[in-house]
Structures are given as C-alpha cells and as structure tokens.
C-alpha cells in the first residue's frame, strides 16, 4: 500500500498518501486555501446582522433627522436685508398717515378674515408724485412676506394724502387676519407709481423668493377720497374649528400644501372690478368677510379699484394658462393613453377614407379605359370583316370576261391620255375595289351593303363599256358617287 502511494501529506490530522508529487502539491495547496474559522460556535451565540438594507437606511435617516424639513439658510439673510432696506429708505410721513395702530383709534376697527382659496386679486396702486413709497412701509416687516399657505398676489391699495400709505394685503395664512382702520378722508390727485413694488414670497419648502408687482393706473386725473380702510395684518387665532393654531407649524405646512394642490386643481372664479370673489370655503369665514366689507367702506366710490389697471387683465390669463399646464402635467397616465388612442383612431379613419377615395378613382378610371378599349375592338372587327368581303369580291371577278376585254381594248392607254376629265374609269375592277376599300377604311363607318352596291355598280358600268367599243373614253359616274357615300 505504501509502495503504491509513497508521498505522505505532512499536514496535521491528515494522513493521505498520493502516487506522485504533483497530487501531493495540489493537496497541500488545498490545505493552505482552507479558511480557519476557529472553534465552532454554539447555537446560543447570536451575531447581529448589520447588512445595509433600504429599511435600515431609512430608519437611520429618521433617527438622525434628515427627513425633517430644514429651514433655508438664506431666510434669515433675506429678512435681515429687507429690514435694512426698509430702515435705509427715507420715511417722511405725516403722523396721521402712518399705518401703525396707535393707542387711540379714531373709529372702531373691523376684523376681516380673508379666505385661503380666494383667487388672485388685481394689484393696483396709487400714490402722489412727490415721494416714491414702497410696499413694505408698515410697522411689522412680516406684512410684506406672503406665508406658504398659497402663492397669491396681494391686493395693494395706495391713496395719496401727503405721501400717506394705505395698504390692504390679503394674508393667505390660515392663522392670520386683517385689522382695518379708517384713515382721514381727503381728496388728492392720483398719479401712477413709476416703478414696481418689491415683495417677498415665502414658499412652502422654506425658500424666500423676491417678486416685483407692476403697479399702474390708466387715468391720472381721477380724484379718489382717502377714506379707504387702513389695513394691517395682525396675527390672531381664528375661531374656525379644524384649523390648527400657530403652536404647531409642521401640520400647518402640510395642510397648506394640501390646500395649495386643491386650489391648483379647481377652477378659480372670475375677478370683476378688483373686488375679490371669495372661494368655496366655510360659511363662517365668508359671512364675516361679507359683513365686514360694507362697514369698512363708507362710500361706494372711494375704492380705487373702479379704474381698471392694465396688468390686472393679464394676470388671470397667465394664471389660467399655468393652471392648464399643471393639470396637463398632473393628468392620469390612463387618461393620457386614452387620448393618445383616440387620436390614433381618428388618424387611422382619415387615412382609410383617403385610401378609399383613391381606390374608387382608380376603379372608375379603369372602367372608362375598358369601355373605350371595347369600342375600339368592335371597330377593328367591323373593318376586318369589310376587308374580307372585298377580297372575296375581287377573287370572284378575277377571271371575268369584261376585265379581259378591257385589257385587250387598251383601256389603260386611253385612261392615261385623257387629262381633261375629272374622273376616269380605273384600270381594272381590282384597283377600283382597292380605292373604295381605302376610302371606307379611312372613314371607318362604311358597311357591307355599301361595298356590295359599289361593286355591282362597277360591274354594270364595265358591262356597258363592252357594248360600246366605239367610244374611246368613258367617264364613270358611280366612282364619284361611291366616294360621297363612303364619306
């Protein structure tokens, strides 16, 4: 046994033998490649599975807090820059025209809660030509920031009373309302503002975007009293049930996102004469807004929104087009596929109709050509029958004695010498028949009866010629009659 396999494995615990050294080298290499796991584990020892799965990844992200909405790092910078700009602007305002609510209010204030789903109001503004007053001249800088409930353009009403500012802003936040106070009435000329108004839009994702509102008015000679209500946004908790307060900002943002989506999908009501038509909301908010409107306005002609502004007409159109684009982007894939199939079916039906008309025209043309071909074939058949009959007549009169007598009497020489006559007798009935055949063939309308009549007339004249040998010339009338009859 040891003689057959002299090569022994020197590995501990292995006593295998091999016949040659190559097998032993391969076996030793297997020992070297074997993994050493150490002692066997007990079943009680449990190793924690740390395989990175998507579920564990999401769990780790939630623990770290990556899914929480982070505040924009530029938000504070924007706020600080806007406050600095407001502070740097020259504010030479009379004490009666400041939009700050003082301790003593001349007339009782009226609270008006604007609904979130209201459509875009008309941005219109009027002020004096002495000073250019921007939008953000209120006491609180938050009046120029639109909260993330909706992206609505505020309705700005500015009347001039020695550079006085009256601002009405539709605050779309569900946790804010508007306090309206009365300003002293005075009549001043209205002139257009030379530039747009700056505005900061606070988006739902935490970003702040600057927006410029164009302000212009068509007539600069209109005198509008300054008895327009003075409006300043004040943070208040409304009594409408179901709307969370300002203490829970996260549910407010999620609800604002849902309402924004609902507002984009539904059709906005029209805007007429700058009066905002309230959207479908709770009856309490709509009733409050309707009751506060006649109290805030003393005279019906005091509003500056009676004069239409040029950018006010383009704003609803652009909003409608953008709404259509959003609806087209948010369409259901099944609806897109259904419309695609409808267009394909319509195109296929049009193609089939065009092809049917083309095939019908080809069939009609083929029928016309086949009828014309049949007519030509019938004419050819008639002409061939006529030629065959004429050949039979010629063969029948080939050995006729009249023809032999004409040849003997020298009819050919007499025919050649006579040049004063119009028509002469042909040299033979064969030539006469050929001449008649050519005439009838050229016309294409001769018949067998006419050919027989011509042949009999020629034979009759030839018989008369044989009875009168004294005449040297015979003028034949039948050939002249045969030609008009053939024609």
From Swiss-Prot:
SUPFAM superfamilies documented for this protein: beta-beta-alpha zinc fingers, Leucine zipper domain
Disulfide bridge map: none
Residues bearing PTM Phosphothreonine: 34, 51, 53, 55, 98
MF term (GO), any: histone H2B acetyltransferase activity
Biased composition (Low complexity): 300-316, 437-449
Any one Pfam family match given in the protein's UniProt record, by short name: bZIP_1
Name of protein: Cyclic AMP-dependent transcription factor ATF-2
């Amino acid at each position: 046994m040891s003689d057959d396999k002299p090569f022994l494995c020197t590995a501990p615990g292995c006593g295998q033998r091999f016949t040659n050294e190559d097998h032993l080298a391969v076996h030793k290499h297997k020992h070297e490649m074997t993994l050493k796991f150490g002692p066997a584990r007990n079943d009680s020892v449990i190793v924690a599975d740390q395989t990175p799965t998507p579920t564990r990844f999401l769990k780790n992200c939630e623990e770290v807090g990556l899914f929480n909405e982070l505040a924009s790092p530029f938000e504070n910078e924007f706020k600080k820059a806007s406050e600095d700009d407001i502070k740097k602007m020259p504010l030479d305002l009379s004490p009666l025209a400041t939009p700050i609510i003082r301790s003593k209010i001349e007339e009782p204030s009226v609270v008006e809660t604007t609904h979130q789903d209201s459509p875009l109001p008309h941005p219109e503004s009027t002020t004096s030509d002495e000073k250019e007053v921007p939008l953000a001249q209120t006491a609180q800088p938050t009046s120029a920031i639109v909260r993330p409930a909706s992206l609505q353009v505020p309705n700005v009403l500015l009347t001039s009373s020695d550079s006085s500012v009256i601002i009405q802003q539709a605050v779309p936040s569900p946790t804010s309302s508007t306090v309206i106070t009365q300003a002293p009435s005075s009549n001043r000329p209205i002139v257009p503002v030379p530039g747009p108004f700056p505005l900061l839009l606070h988006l739902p994702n935490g970003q702040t975007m600057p927006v410029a509102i164009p302000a212009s008015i068509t007539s600069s000679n209109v005198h509008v009293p300054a008895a327009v209500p003075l409006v300043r946004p004040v943070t208040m908790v409304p009594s409408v049930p179901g709307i969370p307060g300002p203490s829970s900002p996260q549910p407010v943002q999620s609800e604002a996102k849902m309402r924004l989506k609902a507002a984009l999908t539904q059709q906005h009501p029209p805007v007429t004469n700058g009066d905002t038509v309230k959207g479908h909301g709770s009856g309490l908010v709509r009733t409050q807004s309707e009751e506060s409107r006649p109290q805030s306005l003393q005279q019906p002609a005091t509003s500056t929104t009676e004069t239409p502004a040029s950018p006010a007409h383009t704003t609803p159109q652009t909003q409608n087009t953008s709404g259509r684009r959003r609806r087209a982007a948010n369409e259901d894939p099944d609806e897109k596929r259904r419309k695609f199939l409808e267009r394909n079916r319509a195109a296929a039906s049009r193609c089939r109709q065009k092809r049917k008309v083309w095939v019908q025209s080809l069939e009609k043309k083929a029928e016309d050509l086949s009828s014309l071909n049949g007519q030509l074939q019938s004419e050819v058949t008639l002409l061939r029958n006529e030629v065959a009959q004429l050949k039979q007549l010629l063969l029948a009169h080939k050995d006729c004695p009249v023809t032999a007598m004409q040849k003997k009497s020298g009819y050919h020489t007499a025919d050649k010498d006579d040049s004063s006559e119009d028509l002469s007798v042909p040299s033979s009935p064969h030539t006469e028949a050929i001449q008649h055949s050519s005439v009838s063939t050229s016309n294409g309308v001769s018949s067998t009866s006419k050919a027989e009549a011509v042949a009999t007339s020629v034979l009759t004249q030839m018989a008369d010629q044989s009875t009168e040998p004294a005449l040297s010339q015979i003028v034949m009338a039948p050939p002249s009659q045969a030609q008009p009859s053939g024609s």
